[in-house]
Amino acid sequence: YTKETLDVALEELQSENVVQRKKCINFISMASRSELFGKTCDTLSVQTWFLSSENREKLIRVLHQETEEKLLWEYLLILLMVCERYIDHGCYAKDFAKESSCVEFKQRAYEIAKQYAHHSSAIVRQMSGSIIGYMGDNDVWDIFCNVMLKKRDLLTISHITLGIRRHCTGVANGDNHFFGGTMTNNQRIDILNSLRLVYQKSSNKSIKGMCLRTIEELENTKEVANKA
């Protein structure tokens, strides 16, 4: 993954051919998730590419033009992964995330997520929620509950339970900023009930296991919060 290969992929995202768009979005998505400082990724060059305001806005323009829900989900995943891996990751300089290019990228990602949080597609709402939660906004809990009423596949539930467990870890560690911010008691009850419903309705052992572990962790987190 280099600046040059990403430039080509970004240009070809404007293709009317959905197969071509899927190929290019997958390439950019893999770059956003690739091993940092690994053999296949020129990390600092790719970081600069993603954080360039020109590339960011081009990516957002093609995102707005996209009509395929799975590709929209992938665009939103890219925004989240850039925030996690190319801005906030612990391997960069201490105040790197405070640089204007980083602040602007996260602000735009948050704006886009808010915009797509009520999209007709449940998977698009889920990934919008994941970004909103990453930014510490507790609107994520209502979004996740809404999604679990409509969509209970392995990928969707794995992203939702990951977010909930990140929240639990952040609370337990006493972090200043953590996934989903403050969870109200009503939101906690709704999330637990939604997870129990998914558990009851699913015949998939992996989904059932994720739900059980997350329910247990969230129930334990409530006790920790009450003691504090």
Could you tell me what each predicted segment is?
Residues 192, 196-228:
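Eukaryotic acidic, Ser/Thr-rich intrinsically disordered low-complexity regions
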Residues 29-33, 77-84, 133, 165-169, ...:
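Structural signature of alpha-helical solenoid repeat scaffolds
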Residues 16-17, 67-68, 120-121, 152-153, ...:
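Short inter-helical turns and helix N-cap capping residues of alpha-solenoid HEAT/ARM repeat scaffolds
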Residues 23-24, 75, 128, 160, ...:
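Conserved hydrophobic register position within alpha-solenoid helical repeats
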Residues 2-11, 34-62, 86-116, 137-149, ...:
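Amphipathic alpha-helical scaffolding segments comprising HEAT/armadillo-like alpha-solenoid repeats
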Residues 1-31:
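N-terminal segments that cap or nucleate solenoid repeat domains
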Residues 31, 73-80, 91, 95-96, ...:
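Surface-facing alpha-helical segments and adjacent helix-coil boundary elements at the starts of domains
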